[in-house]
UniProtKB/Swiss-Prot annotation:
Keyword Membrane: no
Function: Component of the BLOC-1 complex, a complex that is required for normal biogenesis of lysosome-related organelles (LRO). May play a role in intracellular vesicle trafficking.
Protein name per the record: Biogenesis of lysosome-related organelles complex 1 subunit 5
Keywords recorded for this protein, A-Z: Coiled coil
InterPro entries xref list: Bloc1s5 (IPR017243)
Coiled-coil residue windows: 36-91
Family membership noted in the UniProt record: Belongs to the BLOC1S5 family.
GO cellular component: BLOC-1 complex; transport vesicle
Origin species: Nematostella vectensis (Starlet sea anemone)
Record's subunit section: Component of the biogenesis of lysosome-related organelles complex 1 (BLOC-1).
């Protein structure tokens, strides 16, 4: 009996020290009542809002995917348009250079014609001076200078001949 009592006391002490099921159950019931009483409506509203947002996101995802594909196509079209604009700018630039080259060519042609005209005038002046000098020499020495053409177009070299 004494041993039995001792076992009961030990098991009672053991139950109080190590078996907390009753305390935990009471604590759980308290938390549940507290949660349901005070937070039930707020948490339920938050859950409903979250569910609604999730549905909206699920509805928007396919739209976003199709728009993404459209954006890729648009990006490709923009790249093509940019390349065409670049080609047009290059052509315009080349046309400007072409116009400038034509202007330079026309100016050079005018300068060349002016130069050729000046050379022709200088040649005439030199010819006249030569003829005057030849006249003076003929008068002074009695020698006549004549041209001996080697070719029909060539004026040839001057050869002295005595005047008879």
């Amino acid at each position: 009996m004494a041993g039995e009592k001792m076992v009961r006391d030990i098991s009672g002490v053991y139950a109080r020290l190590f078996d907390h099921r009753a305390v935990l159950q009471a604590e759980c019931k308290y938390m549940l009542r507290e949660f349901e009483g005070k937070r039930n409506d707020r948490e339920l509203e938050r859950l409903r809002e979250s569910e609604q947002k999730i549905r909206q996101v699920q509805e928007e995802i396919p739209k976003c995917i199709t728009e993404s594909v459209k954006l890729k196509d648009l990006l490709e079209e923009l790249k093509v348009a940019r390349e065409k604009c670049h080609e047009i700018l290059v052509k315009e630039e080349q046309d400007l250079f072409k116009e400038r080259r034509e202007e330079i060519f026309i100016e050079s042609k005018k300068n060349w014609e002016t130069f050729i005209g000046e050379i022709a005038e200088e040649e005439k002046r030199i010819e006249e001076e030569f003829e005057q000098s030849a006249e003076k020499l003929r008068a002074r020495y009695g020698v006549q200078l004549v041209r001996n053409p080697k070719e029909p177009d060539d004026k040839g070299e001057l050869q002295p001949q005595e005047i008879a």
